[in-house]
From Swiss-Prot:
<keyword id="KW-0342">GTP-binding</keyword>
<protein>
    <recommendedName>
        <fullName>Small ribosomal subunit biogenesis GTPase RsgA</fullName>
        <ecNumber>3.6.1.-</ecNumber>
    </recommendedName>
</protein>
<dbReference type="InterPro" id="IPR012340">
    <property type="entry name" value="NA-bd_OB-fold"/>
</dbReference>
<keyword id="KW-0547">Nucleotide-binding</keyword>
<feature type="binding site">
    <location>
        <position position="269"/>
    </location>
    <ligand>
        <name>Zn(2+)</name>
    </ligand>
</feature>
<comment type="subunit">
    <text>Monomer. Associates with 30S ribosomal subunit, binds 16S rRNA.</text>
</comment>
<dbReference type="GO" id="GO:0046872">
    <property type="term" value="F:metal ion binding"/>
</dbReference>
<feature type="domain" description="CP-type G">
    <location>
        <begin position="77"/>
        <end position="238"/>
    </location>
</feature>
<dbReference type="InterPro" id="IPR010914">
    <property type="entry name" value="RsgA_GTPase_dom"/>
</dbReference>
<dbReference type="GO" id="GO:0005525">
    <property type="term" value="F:GTP binding"/>
</dbReference>
<feature type="binding site">
    <location>
        <position position="262"/>
    </location>
    <ligand>
        <name>Zn(2+)</name>
    </ligand>
</feature>
<dbReference type="InterPro" id="IPR027417">
    <property type="entry name" value="P-loop_NTPase"/>
</dbReference>
<keyword id="KW-0699">rRNA-binding</keyword>
<feature type="binding site">
    <location>
        <begin position="180"/>
        <end position="188"/>
    </location>
    <ligand>
        <name>GTP</name>
    </ligand>
</feature>
<comment type="function">
    <text>One of several proteins that assist in the late maturation steps of the functional core of the 30S ribosomal subunit. Helps release RbfA from mature subunits. May play a role in the assembly of ribosomal proteins into the subunit. Circularly permuted GTPase that catalyzes slow GTP hydrolysis, GTPase activity is stimulated by the 30S ribosomal subunit.</text>
</comment>
<dbReference type="InterPro" id="IPR004881">
    <property type="entry name" value="Ribosome_biogen_GTPase_RsgA"/>
</dbReference>
<keyword id="KW-0378">Hydrolase</keyword>
Amino acid sequence: MKGLVIKNTGSWYLVKTEDGRTIECKIKGNFRLKGIRSTNPIAVGDYVQIIINNEGTAFISEIEDRKNYIIRRASNLSKQSHILAANLDQCMLIVTINYPETSTIFIDRFLATAEAYRVPVKLIFNKTDRYNEDDTRYMDALINLYTYIGYPCFKVSALNNIGTDEVKKDLEGKVTLLSGNSGVGKSTLINAILPEQTLKTGEISDYHNKGMHTTTFSEMFPVDGGGYIIDTPGIKGFGTFDMEEEEVGHYFKEIFEYSAHCKYGNCTHRHEPGCAVRDAVEKHLISESRYTSYLNMLEDKEEGKYRAAY
């Protein structure tokens, strides 16, 4: 029996079958995916085959080939990955300038990972109602930067339902992963787009100005007009996984473009003579923040680097 994984609680998977039923399934203890060292071998968005034993317990017996997936380093196991979702048409990364602040390093790590796994990304700048003049100016500068690179952006106040109609229209007919730091208003945005869901929303920790998780498990929700939203727990850091040093520049669109003009084919864009990328940074043709993110990702082989809350 074939079905779509619509919720993952860690020990159980909720699967929607082709005949419209939803069945709670387990996976056998030895179930593993070839080539992927993951804390969760099955992810929301996966198409699977299920079998039901004589006691009526359903098991996932097989996972079908994925169109794509997006992955990050597991937060507690440095040698393993965590699959955020599978079979995506796009990701939407929710960004906040304050309350809490989303760093450009976090944004760029997410974008580079999505590029590596061939998943298009759009950015949602949320909580626009809370920003002062300086915050708004900085937000607009980031929107100009990422739009120029090739990442469409939305300006939204999910709490006040401003800009949410444009986001909702863009979701129609697509399977979309919603992601972002803890506390950026992901659940509030889903409530604005899909009011029937009434997801729990949380407060911001005063001590660290970081969000506290309100989504505990990954779950998929249908969108009016077709398509699905995949809601995942908020992320405090985004560690890359299985990305070789020489590959990192390929996943920064503008760095990859200028690297074709470097003197050396194996240029790392750090210290080599004749580096077209560093020349472009000095001429402000490549954003300094993007170049800083690139250098930061080159250091990911260092022990424990992924733990930092970027």
